[in-house]
Swiss-Prot record:
Record family assignment: Belongs to the CobS family.
Enzyme Commission code: 2.7.8.26
Protein name: Adenosylcobinamide-GDP ribazoletransferase
Entry superkingdom: Bacteria
Sequence intervals crossing the membrane: 31-51, 57-77, 109-129, 134-154, 176-196
CC cofactor: Mg(2+)
Pfam family, one: CobS
Primary site of residence: membrane
Protein's organism: Stutzerimonas stutzeri (strain A1501)
Length: 245
């Protein structure tokens, strides 16, 4: 139960209070619950969409996007912004890229990337709501957080003594594979929609991981957050394109 609470506290803005400071082992095990947190967030978005039925589609999409950002505290958007600044400003140099990621200030590249990301999500939400295909509301956050579990399972963490290092070092690998297998099976049970979502998430994961390895030799907390946002966006936009035909 405690690892689940740790995952909820870290991945959401919900007021979760832990009984004590988590141990590295508990932090590592919390990764196993990341897909469950994604499923929970997706269920909340689906419920909100049901409650907003009858409202203007534009307003529905805007409110759902605002809720999505509020529930996550914009944590992963921050990672995306930092990664965007660092990737451009690092000029291919790993040390400079890592240094820029530590800078709390956001440059113009970060702002542009965030605007594009939010516009894409808003537009995709509008399409899936109008097409009455709410499965995308669940699949996007689920696969985004499953991607984090997969990332820490197979990718080195490059910042020594960071939180990510404790997560990766204490992740039960056999259980992680079982959790990922359950996610895959669950998506496949949804038929063509689930298969498309899995494919989009998988391709995005592989491309992003390849970029991380080439530039940094591994991942950081910021690039992990960027990966989550990219996977969510790819799944949401891809499913919107499917239903919009």
């Amino acid at each position: 139960m405690l690892p689940l609470l740790i995952a909820l506290q870290f991945l959401t803005s919900l007021p979760i209070r832990l009984p004590a400071m988590p141990t590295p082992r508990q932090q590592g095990r919390s990764l196993l619950h990341y897909p469950a947190v994604g499923l929970f967030l997706g269920a909340l978005l689906w419920l909100a969409a049901l409650l907003l039925e009858g409202a203007s589609p534009l307003l529905q999409a805007a409110l759902l996007l605002a809720l999505w950002v509020a529930l996550t505290g914009a944590l992963h958007l921050d990672g995306l912004a930092d990664s965007a600044d660092a990737w451009l400003g690092g000029f291919g140099d790993p040390a400079r890229t890592l240094e820029i990621m530590k800078d709390p200030r956001s440059g113009p590249v970060a702002v542009v990337v965030l605007v594009i990301m939010l516009l894409l999500k808003f537009s995709a939400l509008l399409v899936v709501l109008q097409a009455q295909q709410p499965a995308a509301l669940v699949l996007a956050p689920l696969l985004g957080r499953a991607a984090l579990l997969a990332l820490f399972l197979c990718t080195p963490y490059v910042r020594p003594n960071g939180l990510g290092q404790a997560l990766a070092a204490n992740l039960p690998r056999s259980r992680a594979l079982m959790v990922l297998a359950l996610v895959v099976i669950g998506c496949l049970l949804l038929g063509a929609t689930g298969l498309l979502a899995l494919t989009l998430a998988g391709v995005t994961f592989l491309l992003a991981r390849r970029a991380m390895l080439r530039r940094l030799g591994g991942t950081t907390g910021d690039t992990a957050g960027a990966l989550l946002e990219l996977v969510e966006c790819a799944v949401l936009v891809g499913l919107a394109l499917q239903v919009g035909r």
